[in-house]
Amino acid sequence: MPDKRALSDSYEQLPLKRAATVSSNTNDISDERIIATLRHPRACVSASGSPFSASPSFQQPVPLCSFSFDEHRKQWHDDRCKRFYRGPPPYNQRHPRQHGARAVFGADLNYGLERFVRRDQDVPEHLDALVAALQHRTEAAVSDEERDQVDQERRKADVVTWRGIITKICTAYEQTAEARFSDPLELNAMMLDDTLYLEEYTCKSARAQKQNKEDDPKMLRMGYYGYSFESYCTVDTELQTREPFRPIPSKESSLPHPAGWSGDVNTNVQWCQVVKTKLGNNRLVIGGEVDAVERNPKTGREELVELKTSMQMTWAQHNPSKAALDQERFEKKLLKFFLQSYLLGIGKIVVGFRDHHGILTTHQDFETLRIPRMVRAGQPIAGRFDHTGKPVIRQQSVWEPKDGLGFGDQILSFIRQTILSRSIQATPTEQISAGAGANTPNPTAAVGQVHHPVYRVTFRSPFDQVEMRCLSEQEIYEEVQDSGGSGARVGFLPRSFYDFVQRRAGS
């Protein structure tokens, strides 16, 4: 049976044309602690060429388990926070700022902003929820035989991480020093039982900068629009998807909530899916948030739906140059949309387009597997026509999925091979010490503390190579283990999960 995850106009699964250069030579590197580098594959080809002849093989994601976070950020190993896609309310509203306009507008995405509850970003979460879900999946089995069978998926995995990290790794190919908004990559990496675990690392100054940006009233409002769109488009039960849109009574006010509003936004609440898949030579177990599900009327199966918002695009008839700029910006944004959904097995993306005032003007459904064709050379450019009225044909691809997936596969293999080559799988020593003085919070002195190597993976401007270095024990304690403030850990993994893995390895 053909792989259902094959891209539209699928690429042949051929070997990579050439591999990116891996080097352990540090002569040209200022930080002597760097132990290995991976050159960006662009260095091997001309500016207009691609280093990859085909996309690496990618297996259709298979669900393993799911879990929920409630409004207090408590994790539950069930689907209580799963949402069902209904779609946005009708476009029959008058615009609050354009009094002479016809009643053809949709939902006001500003609604409920004053009651917006944001998750506390200062609380480090690491991979805790993901590995807890994997541990629970095994321990919930009713027999030893079933536990062994269930745990095989975790033990066979080459990489365990969040979907967002794999997305970031795969979009690394497109990063350039000249880009208006760069997105550097910085990860913590460790091996346990032959499996690579990856988490994102953000230094204190970068966290503060990010928080200040998100606290800016304008940025806060723009970030809120996406969550508001989700509230308008989703409901708690499948039965509610068949109910008509109408104003909802409010407990807090005499005025009802607008039609379609399903509840105030609280970003603590999430429903997450954990899947197994394979990218090139790397077997992955990844977890990520899913916005909603939708019943397929033909198959009867629930299918995953991703919800996004974007600024509406200028009509070409009104301003051709601005329309072309808007189109180009949106097509570049589609790369991240595509990867986020493709990696988790989400087949449908719904994008709500809004105006500058946060009013929904239209929405569009995108089939995930067909997105690469939209930006490929030789295809018509949406909304663009020449003087004869014929569609303008794209001369050059905006992006190619084979490049991002290919470089992503290389980065994962590079990290794994680098750590394995340093014999990191030697059993960590348990330090049984008398304890340190009160004024010396040294992790090496903790009774029963397991010391496990952790590596820092970086890819930053000028984005010409990925670098790896081994963290010191002090860095692990302060930067990875939050100076002991996030509970007992081995590396960045919870000690309870580490002990679980050790028990399973000995079973």
From Swiss-Prot:
Pfam families: RAI1. The keyword Metal-binding applies. Divalent metal cation. It is found in: Nucleus. Keywords: Hydrolase, Metal-binding, mRNA processing, Nuclease, Nucleotide-binding, Nucleus, RNA-binding. A divalent metal cation binds at E230, D291, E306, L307. It comes from the Eukaryota. It is an enzyme of class 3 (hydrolase). GO terms for molecular function: metal ion binding; mRNA 5'-diphosphatase activity; nuclease activity; nucleotide binding; RNA binding; RNA NAD+-cap (NAD+-forming) hydrolase activity. The keyword Nuclease applies. Interacts with RAT1; the interaction is direct, stabilizes RAT1 protein structure and stimulates its exoribonuclease activity. The interaction also stimulates RAI1 pyrophosphohydrolase activity, probably by recruiting it to mRNA substrates. Belongs to the DXO/Dom3Z family. Decapping enzyme for NAD-capped RNAs: specifically hydrolyzes the nicotinamide adenine dinucleotide (NAD) cap from a subset of RNAs by removing the entire NAD moiety from the 5'-end of an NAD-capped RNA. The NAD-cap is present at the 5'-end of some RNAs and snoRNAs. In contrast to the canonical 5'-end N7 methylguanosine (m7G) cap, the NAD cap promotes mRNA decay. Also acts as a non-canonical decapping enzyme that removes the entire cap structure of m7G capped or incompletely capped RNAs. This is Decapping nuclease RAI1. It comes from Mycosarcoma maydis. The gene is RAI1.
